[in-house]
Curated annotation (Swiss-Prot):
GO terms for molecular function: structural constituent of ribosome. GO terms for cellular component: cytosolic large ribosomal subunit. The gene is rplS. One of its GO terms (biological process) is translation. This protein is located at the 30S-50S ribosomal subunit interface and may play a role in the structure and function of the aminoacyl-tRNA binding site. It comes from Neisseria meningitidis serogroup C (strain 053442). The keyword Ribonucleoprotein applies. The keyword Phosphoprotein does not apply. This is Large ribosomal subunit protein bL19.
Length: 121
């Protein structure tokens, strides 16, 4: 492991963030710290994860939601101090790592099947 990777690992350990396991297709609620003037508040952003980029400290993910009939995508840095918490609402069953094709779909066609736990027996 080179020096830069080692420094990134130390920084990730220092941040000590509790990040749940999530993947493309999952519906997540991202709580973002928003500063308006002197006030600070938490803003919830709920949508489907359409991409995840794992690059150590520079990891990020894209969340897509439909707001007022218009598709809105937002990219979040995984270890950003503005991202307070990530909560997985629903697990999606998809066969792709990047779900960019959802940009062209609307309504029922854009639904994602729920991943059910494996049956025992």
């Amino acid at each position: 492991m080179n020096l830069i990777q080692q420094l990134e690992q130390e920084e990730i350990a220092r941040l000590n963030k509790d990040i749940p396991e999530f993947a493309p297709g999952d519906t997540v609620v991202v709580s973002v710290r928003v500063v308006e003037g002197t006030r600070s508040r938490l803003q919830a952003y709920e949508g489907v994860v359409i991409a995840r980029r794992n690059r150590g400290l520079n990891s990020n993910f894209i969340v897509r939601k439909i707001s007022s009939g218009e598709g809105v995508e937002r990219t979040f840095q995984l270890y950003s101090p503005t991202v307070e918490k990530i909560e997985v609402k629903r697990r999606g069953d998809v066969r792709r790592a990047k779900l960019y094709y959802l940009r062209g779909l609307t309504g029922k066609a854009a639904r994602i099947k729920e991943k059910l736990p494996a049956r025992k027996g």
